[in-house]
């Protein structure tokens, strides 16, 4: 059985929107951000900063 904090803050993977490579693993708070997370991060495959979107 998962702990209560794991239910509220699940682990998510962020993928580059241009090359689709999954570069980052992080957690998010479901209560504050129920929709998909989008962050501008550096992609080593593209060699530049791109938008990384939450994958399921």
From Swiss-Prot:
Disulfide bonds: none annotated. SUPFAM superfamilies: Zn-binding ribosomal proteins. One of its GO terms (biological process) is translation. Keywords: Ribonucleoprotein, Ribosomal protein. GO terms for molecular function: structural constituent of ribosome. It holds the Pfam family Ribosomal_L33. One of its GO terms (cellular component) is cytoplasm. Belongs to the bacterial ribosomal protein bL33 family. HAMAP family: Ribosomal_bL33 (MF_00294). PANTHER family: 50S RIBOSOMAL PROTEIN L33, CHLOROPLASTIC, LARGE RIBOSOMAL SUBUNIT PROTEIN BL33C. NCBIfam families: PRK00504.1, PRK00595.1, rpmG_bact. This is Large ribosomal subunit protein bL33. It comes from Bifidobacterium adolescentis (strain ATCC 15703 / DSM 20083 / NCTC 11814 / E194a).
